[in-house]
Amino acid sequence: MERGKKKRISNKLQQTFHHSKEPTFLINQAGLLSSDSYSSLSPETESVNPGENIKTDTQKKRPGTVILSKLSSRRIISESQLSPPVIPARRPGFRVCYICGREFGSQSIAIHEPQCLQKWHIENSKLPKHLRRPEPSKPQSLSSSGSYSLQATNEAAFQSAQAQLLPCESCGRTFLPDHLLVHHRSCKPKGEGPRAPHSNSSDHLTGLKKACSGTPARPRTVICYICGKEFGTLSLPIHEPKCLEKWKMENDRLPVELHQPLPQKPQPLPNAQSSQAGPNQAQLVFCPHCSRIFTSDRLLVHQRSCKTHPYGPKYQNLNLGSKGGLKEYTNSKQQRNRAAPSVTDKVIHATQDALGEPGGALCL
């Protein structure tokens, strides 16, 4: 009986070991299974004592097993995830330039500062004397521990750059000196009248213009004496021969009565007013209908669309400057008015004929 019970118990344990999903191992440890219970549960194996020979069944050999639960593996994984790896900073912090206030890398700030300081000296020398500023000094900021702090250094550099800005007299906003002139053109203070003129406003603006005009002014233009268009002083000598050749070709195409003499180049005056004069006045022709002035080649184009006088070609050919011609035109107009009956007379005569009262008065 006892032997049958032991076999059933061992078979059940083997079935549970085979059906379980976890890897299972059995070891003979003190405190887990006693020697009697272990021998009763697994009759095929015997307890192992050091110094004795191992006696096992040659038909069924089974290694010692250890039971590992899932909970222990989860604890090991969770313990390894408690300390994540430290990711270093991707790039160093920016440094603020104490002259212009812009940000640069720690390597490029050393290259930028000498160039920025040189540019500052050039712009400061162009300003008027009352707008010139002292050379900015590089701030040296120390932390409480006596070491340099990047944040404190950047803050001091930014304050140094902001100290170079000039306030606007109207709105109070701050600008760089070269940008202040551009702002003055469009500055409209709110709720205030026109701003008070500067004591030396003309000198002030002139000085700012000279200081801030980094680009050269527009070159002076000269007007061509043939076509009247504006050209630069360097391009005008190239244009005039071509324009004169073109003028000759267009003049040859005109009718004989509209031919113009060759335009003469005006002599330069000492006050340099010749550059502002238009084309030669000898080239201009009056329209006989509307008295507008055109060049000879444009007059033909204008006459196609010119609205002639409503009284016809007789009035156009009439010389209004002579008194006889004007009287003749006035007398002819009066005769036409007398000969032609008015519309009212026609209506009255038609009504009288309908009533059978010729020559009678119409009573209304």
Swiss-Prot record:
It comes from Homo sapiens. Residues 138-147 have a biased composition (Low complexity). A zinc finger (C2HC/C3H-type) spans 93-122, 164-193, 220-249, 283-312. One of its GO terms (molecular function) is zinc ion binding. It comes from the Eukaryota. Residues 1-10 have a biased composition (Basic residues). Pfam families: zf-C2HC_2. Residues 1-21, 37-60, 127-147, 187-214 are annotated as: Disordered. Zn(2+) 1 binds at C97, C100, H112, C116. This is Zinc finger protein 474. The lineage of its organism: Eukaryota, Metazoa, Chordata, Craniata, Vertebrata. The gene is ZNF474.
